Regions:
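N-terminal pre-domain/capping segments
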Residues: 1-97
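Divalent metal-binding pocket/active-site signature
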Residues: 100
Length: 100
């Protein structure tokens, strides 16, 4: 069984994604979940760490990074089940961007 450590634990303390990943690796974890609270500023560092660090991204929690218009951790800011069509469409777009 593989145990993954979530970036939810330390993403708020880091502006640089590489430093965030290194902190988790230094605790002995090699499987990492990318949490919904990641910001655009984390992405370049995470991608750079993929080239230099020994870890696997085991899962993605919701879409990421958080949309720039969302100022706090809000994993349910755009729901697929929303009664508002615009919110449902935004959830789909953000999820597709995450997958790409």
């Amino acid at each position: 069984m593989k145990l993954a450590f979530s970036t939810c634990w330390n993403s708020r303390r880091h502006k640089n994604g590489s430093e965030m990943i290194s902190e988790i690796i230094n605790l002995g974890f090699r499987h990492i979940e990318l949490s919904h609270g990641l910001r655009v500023s984390h992405l370049d560092g995470i991608l750079a760490a993929r080239k230099t660090e020994d870890f696997e991204i085991s899962s993605v929690h919701n879409f990421l990074p958080m949309p720039v218009e969302i100022m706090t951790d809000a994993p349910d800011c755009y729901e697929f089940t929303s009664h508002r069509k615009q919110d449902r469409e935004r959830a789909v777009r953000l999820t597709r961007q995450t997958i790409d």
